[in-house]
From Swiss-Prot:
Function: Catalyzes the attachment of tyrosine to tRNA(Tyr) in a two-step reaction: tyrosine is first activated by ATP to form Tyr-AMP and then transferred to the acceptor end of tRNA(Tyr).
Protein name: Tyrosine--tRNA ligase
Domain S4 RNA-binding, chain residue ranges per copy: 348-411
Lineage: Bacteria, Bacillati, Cyanobacteriota, Cyanophyceae, Synechococcales
CDD domains: TyrRS_core
Sequence motif 'HIGH' region, location on chain: 50-59
Organism of derivation: Prochlorococcus marinus (strain MIT 9312)
GO annotation, biological process: tyrosyl-tRNA aminoacylation
Keyword NAD: no
GO molecular function: ATP binding; RNA binding; tyrosine-tRNA ligase activity
Amino acid sequence: MSDKLILPSWLSRGIEEYFPIKGIDQTFSEIIDDAKKNNKKLRVKLGIDPTGTDIHLGHSILFKKLRAFQDNGHIAVLIIGDFTAQIGDPTGKNKTRVQLSEKQVKDNAKTYLTQLGMGKPANESILDFDSKDKIEIRYNSEWLKGLNLNSIIELMGSATVSQMLAKEEFNKRYNSQVPIALHEFLYPLLQGYDSVVVQSDIELGGTDQKFNIAIGRDLQRHFKQEPQFGVLLPILTGLDGIKKMSKSEFNTVGLTEDSLSMYSKLEKVPDNIIPTYFELLTELDLSVLNDANPRELQRRMALEVTTLFHGAEEASKAQSNCEKLFLGHKEKVGEIPEISLKDIVFPVKFFYLLSSLKLFKSSSESKRSIKGGGVKIDSQKVINPDIVFDSKKDLEGKILQIGKKIIKRFEN
């Protein structure tokens, strides 16, 4: 029997993988069962690098699982990577990240904690901040900023270059002769050292974090600690049903979005990702997927997720208002004037695209409007004028809104 099959449902739901199956003395399920029987609080680590200002539904999966551990008697150890964020996790990147300033990182961290519900009652927040015995919030600058050269050399001596090059992103860049900065090799070691300092029993992460979590296990072993278990959750597919949820793909739902915006986006997701959204974003029994038609499932899922983040009353209002808008304006999408992309040379920066389409008098005016939050794509503000669109497919069919008056639909 797979060890996963005997895990409690609150833990097994949505998990892509955990490792190892068996620790030094016990399997993962035995660790969980033993903790319950003996009222032992496991230390469950989740690290977040505040490299941006907004949390979206893709991020929320990990926080929901961390909350499940809290609700079942364990300690959430939330690591704010204020030091590591200034380096930048190379995971998923084909080039060196731009380093952030200390002030940028601190400001971002404040917005993250606010979005997670800090200051709100436990029944209105994503994490339980009320019960001090259920959460520890640590900033890794506490221990990383003061590391001396001897300590850094000891960390670096616990891993090998060949081990680092086994990481997919490093391997690709090395083989393609794309530069890898030495400080990027240090990132997984610093994340792993966080686990040593907080003595985590379990670390949560997306499937793309397996390498970094495994490094944490190695470092705990190096420092004579019992290695943590890794629990990996899927990377959520975005609203387009194809690419991972990411602001750069304009396929996200942000936690700060109002209830109408959240509901209206979710009720239009493609059929192929509805089951995944039900499993990862709601608490409903998955048997609801068996009989209902896709349209009913879209509405049910959108209502449940909006309820989770805005409450039942706001979610119900959003559903009602969305239906009124649909009934009153269902023909109007086809009436939105098109704007052709046929003469645009891709790849192209966003500000240059808009000025090339004669939507602004100059590139500088285009930049100012974008930075000021006056431009949206599919109801989502785009505030980075330098974002690059690789091809027409990135924009075809999407709705561009500039201020309150200009609305266009991108077409080839």
